[in-house]
Amino acid sequence: MPKDIPILDVFQPGLKRGAERLAFAPHKRYFYVEHPTEGWRVYLRACCFLHEAGVPVKKDRFLVVKRFGSNPSAKSWEPPKGQMEGKDGLRDPKQPILQLLEENVQREVEEEAKIKEILQLRHTGLVLQSQEKDYPSNHFFQYHVFQGFVTPQEIARAADEFKWLHDHPKAWERMRKDKREKDDLTWFSPTKTKMMGRWSPSLIVMYMGDKSV
């Protein structure tokens, strides 16, 4: 991505909203906002760093999930994250973008980490903006970084749900694909939970290095 492109303001009024199929998942339509005169387009993504509730926050102690069926020792872990689909972003054209992002990240956390109750969920103000290799020059994506807290009881319940699913493989098979993308949950460790993909390592460096959150 060109170095001189600032973080584009996806919260400003007057942006067009739409959805488009992308090459990596052509069976889905992904939500975007587009500037009516400048022409840039941003696909919206969200990532959530979940800490244990009721104890002092340690920036390097957050929950990560493992890619379904992968070797736990491989680069197969990441914080819960995902990209907003058109069916979610276009339901109400007047719904604020921040609210859409909050709903999106809660949905991703429930699908990937089996966590249903997040306390004090908030947008950290951190945004990772970049481009995929097949994007046109004026198309971008943004990861909006959220922070939340989870009780030990909710973490234990989610872990039990993963255990039950491992013990009942036919139940896994019956689940929608987007609900079985991940199959384990644990605390981040720089040596034991190696990060997958292009963007998870950058998101972690951004989050852990920012002193304002």
Give the positions of each predicted feature.
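Acidic, metal-coordinating catalytic segment for phosphate/diphosphate chemistry
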Residues: P2-P56, S70
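A short coil-to-beta-strand element that immediately follows conserved catalytic motifs
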Residues: K116-V127
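Short, P/G- and charge-enriched loop/turn segments at secondary-structure junctions
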Residues: Y30-G39, E132-Y135, K170-M175
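Conserved beta-strand and immediately adjacent loop positions that scaffold enzyme active sites
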Residues: C47, R61, D184
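Short hydrophobic/aromatic beta-strand or adjacent loop that forms the aromatic wall/cage
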Residues: Y43-C47, F140-V145
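Conserved Nudix-box catalytic region and its N-terminal flanking loop in Nudix hydrolases
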Residues: V57-E111, I115
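Nudix hydrolase/Nudix homology domain
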Residues: P72-S76, P80-G82, G86-K87, H139, ...
